[in-house]
């Protein structure tokens, strides 16, 4: 039944959530058999029905390749699915506590409509134990069915990396787990139809959940170390980029870089792990310290910008600063939890006028989410300083002459990701600071 050539027609898969994680699942399974993409956002559904990815990660040609894909905002379609994959956001609230409301809401909707014998697979990032402690009871309550008798549950943490065309759903090993050995094999075979390198089987759902949160916690902590080193080197008067390049010549030096840590994964997932630890009476110190450092980098960069402007002789109050980039990372349109906003707000607290250019993201979304009006490159003023906040490819392609047209002579250039030629900028009379 799992054979891609013999039995695909017997399957109907449904994916709940048509974001960065869910839509690629619909597309890949939709190339082989009926795959239903469900989302409560009618706008997302309408965009997908027209053959356009709302997040602009997938090209229209890729969308069209999924000849068996369907899209709906009617939850009744979930009753037709043999497999239901859950790919909804799992954010944190303002106090950095896990917000499971999207996941609970999705589980309620699924429970009300799923058929007997269905396998529900969660992909959303959660703390170890959340699927069995929070989601399964909701499925039982809403459906009136019994777990492991009438329906089964698996877990396979998403590994989608927005803006990354190298590491995709189909070429990255998928971690899988199931509530029974039979479910595990069923889930493994299901994903093996689309994931070329295959799957890694975990012995429990909890182990698979833990796997995901530590992947991002490890990265968060490594970046936090680089950020702390950058702060120290700045005080010493050293260029962090040069020091890291030198250290990188050793075979076992891990090549992480300092920078802003935002988005819906790296800056969020550690809080899910620390929440679980707190529930068990253990209060993590290293993980929280890393989060504190990374969350403070926007303020630090803004402060350095002001110091560099003063060193240039600029009068700070009423000064103009151009910020290049607003998304949480390079080469993607995702504005969620962007730490560039920390820089912008801190600069504005000095009565600095901030202008933002972001070529990848939606201007309407930036205005709605943050109250920020995005400007085309041509409309940016000649400012007292430029903050190159996000390393988009389009910014890397800019010539020194392009940059100097948008900054006063003798102004300050703040290169957060060290992506531009500092020597050439200095030769053009620009003061350069980089993280």
Segments (PLM) and residue ranges:
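Structural/interface elements that position substrates and couple domains in central-metabolism enzymes
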Residues: 2-435
């Amino acid at each position: 039944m799992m054979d891609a050539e013999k039995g695909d027609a017997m399957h109907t898969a449904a994916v709940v959530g048509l974001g960065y994680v869910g839509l690629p699942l619909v597309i890949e399974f939709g190339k082989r058999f009926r795959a239903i993409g469900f989302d409560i956002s009618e706008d997302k559904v309408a965009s997908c029905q027209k053959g356009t990815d709302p997040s602009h990660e997938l090209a229209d040609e890729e969308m069209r390749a999924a000849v068996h894909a369907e899209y709906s905002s009617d939850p009744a379609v979930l009753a037709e699915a043999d497999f239901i994959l859950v790919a909804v956001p799992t954010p944190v609230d303002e106090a950095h506590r896990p917000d499971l409301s999207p996941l609970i809401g999705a589980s309620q909707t699924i429970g009300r409509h799923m058929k007997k014998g269905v396998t529900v697979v969660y992909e959303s990032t959660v703390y170890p134990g959340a699927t069995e402690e929070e989601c399964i009871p909701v499925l039982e309550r809403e459906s009136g069915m019994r777990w492991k008798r009438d329906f089964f549950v698996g877990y396979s943490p998403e590994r989608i990396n927005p803006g990354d065309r190298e590491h995709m759903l189909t070429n990255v090993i998928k971690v899988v787990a199931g509530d029974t050995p039979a479910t595990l094999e069923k889930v493994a075979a299901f994903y093996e139809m689309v994931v070329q390198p295959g799957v890694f089987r975990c012995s429990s759902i909890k182990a698979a959940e833990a796997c995901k949160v530590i992947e991002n916690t490890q990265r968060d902590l490594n970046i936090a170390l680089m950020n702390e080193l950058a702060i120290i080197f700045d005080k010493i008067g050293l260029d962090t980029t040069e020091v890291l390049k030198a250290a990188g010549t050793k075979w076992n030096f891990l090549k992480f870089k300092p920078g802003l840590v935002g988005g819906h994964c790296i800056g969020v997932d550690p809080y899910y792990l620390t929440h679980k630890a707190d529930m068990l009476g253990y209060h993590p110190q290293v993980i929280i310290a890393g989060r504190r450092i990374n969350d403070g980098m926007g303020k630090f960069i803004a402060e350095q910008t002001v110091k560099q402007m003063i060193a240039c002789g600029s009068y700070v109050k009423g000064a103009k600063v151009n910020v290049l980039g607003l998304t949480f990372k390079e080469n993607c349109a995702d504005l969620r939890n962007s730490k560039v906003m920390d820089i912008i707000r801190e600069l504005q607290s000095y009565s600095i006028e901030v202008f933002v250019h972001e070529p990848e993201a939606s201007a309407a979304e930036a205005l709605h989410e943050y109250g920020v009006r995005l400007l085309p490159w041509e409309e940016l003023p000649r400012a007292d300083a430029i903050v190159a906040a996000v390393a988009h490819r389009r910014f890397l392609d800019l010539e020194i002459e392009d940059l100097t047209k948008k900054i006063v002579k003798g102004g300050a250039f703040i290169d957060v990701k060290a992506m531009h030629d500092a020597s050439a900028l200095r030769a053009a009379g620009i003061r350069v600071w980089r993280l």
